[in-house]
């Protein structure tokens, strides 16, 4: 998984139409009560970073849509609390939560289908963070994510696969592949 911000630092004119998105930023989203009753609230295991993607992912699995609304205006300072964009705290938690997000939301067949892309993404991020002196922090975070996923606490919140949601998983998979192509072209 690799979360990215749609339209960041791009002309606003290109984003004037409502459109479906995978998940919304937690600092800029509104959820229906019915969705939260069905999917649950924010997962405390995430604490910070990717908790919004987790909730959006669970909504998608349950068949809900996440929609970008261009008329909504939100002022949100990303990483406002932790300071810099890349610091040990954020890199550690983000990498941990990335692994947990995949484990929690993807059924085994989808994890296997995406494993080559996930491993490549983790490798690219190791190289990226090596240039910033944070590769060790990133790798330790990945290890923490694996341990969290395998713990009783992590397994307790894993989304149970239900056959009725198979079409939703199919749509999610197509979107993941489309987003992969978007990232490659960007």
What is each PLM-predicted segment?
Residues 111-186:
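Non-catalytic, C-terminal membrane-associated alpha-helical segments of glycosyltransferases
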